[in-house]
């Protein structure tokens, strides 16, 4: 037994609740197998009093989406002086905001696609930029709310202006870059291997189903790329991680257009999924680490005020 009391936070109330429960359960299981004293907490509005009562040695943050990875729970844990995993308050808030994260990444020499941030209510019949482009909620993950507008399509107001839209009113409109889906993880200050994601033909892009359904996508790790492109993905992943101020593990996503040679950084994820079909465990395997190795490393890296 390690003697370390780890509370795993999962669930919550964001649109990524089910993914968080899967990540949290998997991580809690492996930590228990490694001898940690684990308590699983499905987060609700009583979380402050729950944490005050438990007073864990460490919190493993397996929450996804708003509240869990935008600086909110991180601020609570800082106030309670409980060491926690993954990025801190500022980096979490910045990374969750796709527009601001792109500005910071670009300032560090990371290649990004042209984009603009606006209210969804300002959209009209005319395209906000020349199609093809992508519309994304500014603060969502797991591809929730993503709309791709093709070259010959009209403005999809019915998808964005209807009453079923449950995401932020602020959106990002970004040039669509065709090509291969690439991702790369950073662990501390070490950049890991590059992985290519190949969604099954039934999926238009790497959406929620292709991410989380068993067999929804193929992970090729290490990716079959030229050494120049491979190293550029690694360089930009580390540059974004450091410029935004991330700690622990992060994962950056890219698009690579082989026809034009265009390599574009899309976003950084400070709370990457840790389910059985998640990317970080697969990337870890390529670097000689087991799933248990990486979960243990994340826990031992936990801290406050960093």
From Swiss-Prot:
Pfam families: Dala_Dala_lig_C (PF07478), Dala_Dala_lig_N (PF01820)
EC number(s) per entry: 6.3.2.4
Named cofactor requirement(s): Mg(2+); Mn(2+)
Pathway named in the protein's UniProt entry: Cell wall biogenesis; peptidoglycan biosynthesis
Keyword annotations: ATP-binding, Cell shape, Cell wall biogenesis/degradation, Cytoplasm, Ligase, Magnesium, Manganese, Metal-binding, Nucleotide-binding, Peptidoglycan synthesis
Keyword Disulfide bond: no
Subcellular location: Cytoplasm
Catalytic activity: 2 D-alanine + ATP = D-alanyl-D-alanine + ADP + phosphate + H(+)
Residue numbers binding Mg(2+) 1: 253, 267
Cellular component aspect of the GO annotation: cytoplasm
Keyword DNA repair: no
Location of the ATP-grasp domain: 102-300
Predominant subcellular localization, coarse grouping: cytoplasm
Residues bound to ATP: 128-183
Residues that bind Mg(2+) 2: 267, 269
GO molecular function: ATP binding; D-alanine-D-alanine ligase activity; metal ion binding
UniProt xrefs under InterPro entries: ATP-grasp, ATP_grasp_subdomain_1, D-Ala_lig_Van_CS, D_ala_D_ala, Dala_Dala_lig_C, Dala_Dala_lig_N, PreATP-grasp_dom_sf
Broad class of enzyme this protein falls into: ligase
Cofactor note: Binds 2 magnesium or manganese ions per subunit.
GO biological process, one term: peptidoglycan biosynthetic process
Similarity comment text for this entry: Belongs to the D-alanine--D-alanine ligase family.
Function noted in UniProt: Cell wall formation.
Name of this protein: D-alanine--D-alanine ligase
Organism annotation: Bartonella bacilliformis (strain ATCC 35685 / KC583 / Herrer 020/F12,63)
Lineage: Bacteria, Pseudomonadati, Pseudomonadota, Alphaproteobacteria, Hyphomicrobiales
